[in-house]
C-alpha cells in the first residue's frame, strides 16, 4: 500500500497530511478507440491543502503496474468573483492645472477571452479572480490609438484596484479616453434614444506629422503631439469635446444628413464643448509658455454679424456660439439653453458658406419656436426677450437676413427736400416693425430719424428736410424688428457708438470744380514724392491686385470705385504672396 500512496501523491505540489488505501480493489474501464481497457486499481485517498483551501483527492492506482491513472479533488469550491475598480491619472482641464485620479468608465477588460466593461463608477465584476485580466484604453465609446497601437497591460484578476498611469500609458492617451467618454455621456444626456454614436470612435493621440491642432474626420477624432510651442492637444479635454461635437453634427444633425455650413459646424461644436464645461473659454492653456492662452473665448470677445463675418469658419462660428452663450447667461440655466439648441438638430437650418445671415436668423427663429408654449410665436414666447437680446448682441435679429438696397446719394440741391429711396426684401415680413433713415448735419453728434414709408411693394422712401448750401449731411438706413432691435444697417456698423463705420455723406449746394478718379478725369496728383524714403508701400496709380491673408482675409481690394473704370491709387501691388504689411503705407 505504501507504493500505491507514493504513486498517488506523485507530482502533487502540496504536502499530504493524511492517506489511506481502501481494502477492496475496483475495476476501472478506460475507453480506447473501439473498446475499453479494464484495469484493476487500488483506491487511494489523500488529504492536503492547495492554494484555495483544503483538498481531498480520490486517486486510482493500477494494482499491477503502480501507474497513477486518475486523481481528482472531491472538494468543490465556489469560484470567487473579482470586483475591480479602474481609474487613471488625467488632466481634467489643461496641463497648467494639477492632474487628477478619475474613474475610467466604459473601459474594456478582457478575462478568459471574454470582454467586460467598467460601469459609470469605474467598477467591473469578473466571474472569477483567477488568472490575469487585460486592461485597454478602449471601450464602448472610445478607442485610443498612438501610432496605431491601443495602450493595454495585464494584471492579476485578484487585484481589486487598477491604475492607468505612466507605467502603462501616457497622460495624453488617458486624458483623451476620459474626455471622449465625457462628451459622449453629455451628448447622450440630450439625445438618450439616439444610438448612432454608440460605438468606440477612433481616438488618435500624439500624431507627429504636425502640431498645434486637432481635427475630426470620417468618424475619428485626432490630436497632434506637443510641438511648435503648443501642448499635446489631447491633454486639453475641451478640445476633444469640440472635435466630438463635429461627430455629433455629422451623425445627428438634420436626421443624420450632416451639416453643410462651415461656420455653423464650428460654432455648434464649440457649443457642445462650452455646454459641458459651462466655462466661456475654449482650449485654455493652449501654449506651453502661457497658462492664459486659449483657442477662443466668449466672455470678453464679442463677434457681431455682419462686420465680423470674414469667411473663416472658426471666426464665423464664434458669432452663433456667442449668441448661444449669452442665451445661457440671460436664461441662467444651461439645460434650458440646451433644450432650445438640441431642437436645431431636427429643424436642421443650413446652407453653403456665405449664407450665415440667413442661417443664423433661422436659428433665432427656431429658438423662439422651441421656446413657444401656445403654437403662436407672433404673440411672444415665455423667454423671447432673453433670447432676442442674446442674439442681438451678436448682430443677429429677426431681420438679419433682410436685404436693404439703396443707391448712395452724394449731392443735393440747396433748399429742397432730399429724397432717400430704398428697396427692402424680407424673409419674415411679420418681424418688421419699421424702417428708418437716420441723419445728422455737419458736426452734430445727434442723429435724427425719419421713418421710411412704403411707396409700393418692396419700395420705400423718406425725405431728409431741406438744407442750406454748404451743409454736409451724414445718413444711414436701418430696419427695426418687433423687439426693437436694429438690423440691415446700411452702411453696416454706421450706427455704432464705438468704432463706427462711415455713414453716407451728402454735399448740399456744392458745384463740382475738379474731379480726380484716376481713370477718365486725371488731375495733377503726383505719386512717390522725391523726398519719400520708403522702400515699399509707395503710392502707385494702376490696376489694383487683390491680396488676401491666408487666401481669406482681404488686405488689398481687387476693385476700384469709378463706374466702368479700371485704375485707382494704391500702396504697391504685391504679386509675390509677401507678408500682409509688405506694401502698407508705413513703408
Regions found by a protein language model. Give the residues of each.
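Edge beta-strands of extracellular beta-sandwich domains
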Residues: 142-158, 486-494
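Glycan-association/targeting regions that enable binding to alpha-glucans and other polysaccharides
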Residues: 387-527, 531-539
